[in-house]
Amino acid sequence: MGYFEDTGNFDARTEGMSYAMMMCVQMDMKNEFDRVWKWARTYMYMEDGYNKGYFAWSCKTTGEKNDLGPAPDGEEFFAMALFFASHRWGDGEGIFNYSQEARNILSACIHNGEKEPGDPIMEPENYLIRFIPSRKFSDPSYHCAHFYELFSMWANEEDRPF
């Protein structure tokens, strides 16, 4: 496993980890991609609780979560990097079934809070990405419009219209 460290804060952040995965897939560095993804999926991913299906935005380099909230730009970049990996290298097993992992992330972003406690990252009233799930305002830097057309083709069928 491997992580990218924020050298100003001495932690690993979803923004840096997901950007690193995007760089790796674009440079055809599968081994490094898998190492970063495994670290993120092992230590940052939240399996249960209010933010189930999201990633803790900051972790110590030991893997301990600094915060249990997501920074939604990380979820977007994780999903797109995983879709690109699926198209470049094909899908593997478990967490390396890249396209399924990406679809799961997007599904959480749209559906969290519908059947159990939680909030979506994508605002259902205006379709804008939220700054954090529990707040109904956005951060323009989180808008990855260049991703949305591909998400509409590769997401779960029921999520494509979103």
Give the label of every model feature segment.
Residues 10-14, 49-52, 67-73, 96-162:
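Extended ligand-binding clefts on enzyme/binding-domain cores
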Residues 1-75, 81, 88-91:
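N-terminal carbohydrate-binding/catalytic regions of secreted carbohydrate-active enzymes
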Residues 76-106:
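Internal, well-ordered domain-core segments that constitute the primary functional module
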Residues 24-28, 44, 82-89, 106-113, ...:
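Sec/Tat-exported extracytoplasmic proteins
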